[in-house]
Amino acid sequence: MKINFTKMEGIGNDYVYIDATKNDIRLSPEQIQKLSDRNFGIGGDGVIFIRNSNSGEFQMDMYNSDGSSSEMCGNGVRCVGKFVYDHGLTKNQKPTIETGKGVLTLDLKTGTNGKVEMVTVDMGEPILKPSLVPIVWKGDEPVINQVIEVQGKQYHFTAVSMGNPHCVIYVDDADDFPVREIGPIIENHPFFPRRVNVEFVSIKGKDHLYQRTWERGTGETLACGTGACAVTVASILNGKTGRSVRIDLRGGTLHIEWQENGSVFMTGPAKEVFSGEVEI
């Protein structure tokens, strides 16, 4: 079977995008792993199908590079917005996208060539109730600045869900931190029944943070949009920043704002890398 695809990236968080609005394309976990393979496939952090939706204009159906399904990807949903607009699936510059977190509204900003360059996403309200993050914890109070022990060392973390679970940890120097050693241990920690994405964060200045992310089912990625939203929420809850934050990641920069009304807004670029046809 031959499939048309488009490779896209949002500050280095790259996925293989497949338009399934006309044909109901479904792939097995093994096929998704094959497409995501950076040596023997197209290469990416996973595969995202763009489908028709009964609750929004389109649905984002997302899978990690290991073939497991995922609820949400902030960088991914920005690229979905660019895809549906640039490829003529909609003329609406404020399309609604159904995700595992619910229906999100995007605000598309086009450049001089008429193509989408920047996207702002209303990511909705963060989820802090432990049972909904989810995290195995006593009580219903948000898990803020609590202790997790890894390899005999204690780390303070805050648990936030942006439709997918995040564990935010502050370190002195995230760039020098052993993310690939500690990340997978926390990802699979008994605290987190559905595993967890882990953010390692250092403070660069006033309302300016640096983030590295270990994504569940994928490993370290150059960027994580929902992670940046979770980091912003955690930073405000811990009194480290104001409500509008610049977050630098290895792939680029995102601007996140947690508004007083509860919604988190994420702004960042979306780019198309190349497109083609693949035998699967």
UniProtKB/Swiss-Prot annotation:
Pathway: Amino-acid biosynthesis; L-lysine biosynthesis via DAP pathway; DL-2,6-diaminopimelate from LL-2,6-diaminopimelate: step 1/1. GO terms for molecular function: diaminopimelate epimerase activity. One of its GO terms (biological process) is lysine biosynthetic process via diaminopimelate. Its EC number is 5.1.1.7. The keyword Endoplasmic reticulum does not apply. The record marks H166, E215 as: Could be important to modulate the pK values of the two catalytic cysteine residues. Substrate binds at N13, N64, G74, N75, N164, N197, E215, R216, G225, T226. The keyword Cytoplasm applies. Keywords: Amino-acid biosynthesis, Cytoplasm, Isomerase, Lysine biosynthesis. It is found in: Cytoplasm. Gene3D superfamilies: Diaminopimelate Epimerase, Chain A, domain 1 (3.10.310.10). GO terms for cellular component: cytosol. PROSITE patterns: DAP_EPIMERASE. It comes from the Bacteria. Homodimer. Belongs to the diaminopimelate epimerase family. Catalyzes the stereoinversion of LL-2,6-diaminopimelate (L,L-DAP) to meso-diaminopimelate (meso-DAP), a precursor of L-lysine and an essential component of the bacterial peptidoglycan. This is Diaminopimelate epimerase. It comes from Leptospira biflexa serovar Patoc (strain Patoc 1 / Ames). The gene is dapF.
